[in-house]
Amino acid sequence: MASWYDALPALVAELAVRWGLGVGEAGGGGTSRVYRCLRDGETVWLKLTPDPVIATDEAEALRAWADTRSVVGLLDQDLRVGALLLAGVEPGTRLMESGWQLAHVARLLVELRSVTYDRSPQLAPLADRITFLYDLADRRGTADPDLLSRGRAAALEMARTGPADGLVHGDLHPENVLIGAGGRLVAIDPRPALGDPDFDAVDWVIEGVEDEEQLNRRIADLAALVPGMSAARVRGWCRATAPLIGGAPAFLAPWPPHTLPPHGQAAR
């Protein structure tokens, strides 16, 4: 990573010339670096990652969602160097800073689920994303190993028994949603996979709940607004991924995999 950061100034300068960018302040961290830029008087974002696979997968998903207004637009790319040029979103306030209503999130989820993904090369299955997340949690060592083991088994069973071909954002939470023109919600920073799109509902139904009754009400309310969403599957994903979510309520400890709701089970 140190060598990648050392090479960034030259790479940014090269891309700025190629794409006609006036480069402004930088931000981001973890797996990417993001630069606010101007092109032809409009704000655009230059996103760089040291892992070309991450950039390739993100670009693939953004192209698939290109006809929706609820996902940031992809303007250009150089996947060889892990570079994406993304459209600006104005005002661009992160949803976590402004608060949100379930009905608005439901409209975002409906848009994300409206795309039929039949492109090649194929994105990785959701089970791979789950394995990555639990491997990361294991390495960090901040959660109970038995809880992580049960959560991993439950999540992989959820992936195995659910839809295999839905386009999943994979990292959809209020930090990765911006407010666009007219209050429209715009998703950014996908870590996409193919599988059960109900996976993307978890953060929206867990946040702030204090007991299982409140969780079930919120899940039922969201499922009523999103065609094709299974309340039972969303509950299953909440339990299966709870060990990965900081501050998840204790009542969401993963249940044994054999008790998970089957794909398509009706809400109760």
Region locations from a protein language model:
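A glycine-centered beta->alpha junction motif in the catalytic cores
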Residues: 51, 68, 80-99, 114-118, ...
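Short strand-connecting beta-turns/loops that link adjacent beta-strands
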Residues: 39-42, 79-81, 181-183, 239
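A conserved alpha-helical element in kinase catalytic cores
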Residues: 9, 42-85, 89-112
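An alpha-helical support segment within catalytic cores of ATP-dependent transferases
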Residues: 4-12, 117-170, 180-181, 223
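Helical subdomain adjoining the active site within ATP-dependent kinase catalytic cores
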Residues: 220-225, 233, 243-268
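ATP-binding glycine-rich phosphate-binding loop
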Residues: 4-39
